[in-house]
């Protein structure tokens, strides 16, 4: 059975085509396009007409492709920008005209779904997954208990158990911070950069504090999303982008700081020319 899933975030819209047999994904093809649906939403709480147009156009091409490939079902979910926007129903009508039943999912569901996908690479390890998007960051702590621990957990041999201990969605993302602190300008000011740092540090510290009250400390921090993958791509100067070289890679705090300094020192045009950074990501 071929299934299609469309995920519409604040910055990107994604399509996954998955061949599923006996409840398992056998093959998957992924497609990503930057549509910037959340442009201006942090300030106005409304989706721009041109952003809706970009998004519906992208999704229309995704639906056409999925149906040509023989997808038996197409699921469409929307996240942070749609959650925040008062006129999200306008977008919903456009998507419904394509034959979809779009669902705006809560941040906690978004986080749990992300964790489900990520945890298969870290079976039997307690991990903290941070899915940093354009408008929000989902933090999830938990463990995918695999067959090696079946006797301990009382599962049937070969079974798996998803044990999520903490999940929270924080209104903190690259587009939200960029727009609130004018970070898309050429050479953003030290004051604006410091303001973004303080906001991020406070919100993340509070969320991590709540996690510490609810569960044991994780073994690993796993970064997910376009911000995390872009950091690796810029550091390693990937051109063209190669997901195989990004997946399960590592990056240090010092390296993140160096890349931040590099981006802050450049004009928008210069950021567009940085090897490894998608041109449409340069403004955020």
PLM region spans:
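N-terminal glycine-rich anion-binding loops that anchor highly charged ligand groups
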Residues: 24-39
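N-terminal basic/disordered segments at the start of proteins
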Residues: 1-27
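A short acidic Gly-Thr/Ser loop motif
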Residues: 7-12, 130-136, 144, 224-227
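Helical "lid/coupling" subdomains associated with nucleotide-phosphate turnover
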Residues: 3, 17-20, 36, 40-69, ...
């Amino acid at each position: 059975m071929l299934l299609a899933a469309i995920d519409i975030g604040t910055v990107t819209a994604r399509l996954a085509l998955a061949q599923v047999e006996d409840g398992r994904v056998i093959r998957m093809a992924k497609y990503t396009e930057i549509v910037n649906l959340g442009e201006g939403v942090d300030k106005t709480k409304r989706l721009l007409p041109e952003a809706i147009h970009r998004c519906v156009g992208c999704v229309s091409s995704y639906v056409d492709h999925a149906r040509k490939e023989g997808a038996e079902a197409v699921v469409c979910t929307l996240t942070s920008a749609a959650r925040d926007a008062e006129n999200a129903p306008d977008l919903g009508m456009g998507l419904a005209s394509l034959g979809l039943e779009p669902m705006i999912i809560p941040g906690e569901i978004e986080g749990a779904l992300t964790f489900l996908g990520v945890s298969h690479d870290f079976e039997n390890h307690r991990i903290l997954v941070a899915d940093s998007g354009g408008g929000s960051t989902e933090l999830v702590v938990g463990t995918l208990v695999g067959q090696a621990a079946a006797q301990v957990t009382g599962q049937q041999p070969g079974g798996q158990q998803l044990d999520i201990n903490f999940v929270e969605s924080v209104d903190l993302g690259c587009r939200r911070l960029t727009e609130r602190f004018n970070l898309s300008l050429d050479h953003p000011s030290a004051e604006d950069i410091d303001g973004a740092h303080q906001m991020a540090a406070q919100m993340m510290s509070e969320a991590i504090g709540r996690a510490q009250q609810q569960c044991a400390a994780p073994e690993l921090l796993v970064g997910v999303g376009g911000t995390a993958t872009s950091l690796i791509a810029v550091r390693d100067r990937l051109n063209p982008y190669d997901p195989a070289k990004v997946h399960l890679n590592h990056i240090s705090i010092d390296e993140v700081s160096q890349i931040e300094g590099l981006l802050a020192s450049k004009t928008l045009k210069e950021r567009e020319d940085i090897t490894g950074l998608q041109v449409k990501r340069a403004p955020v």
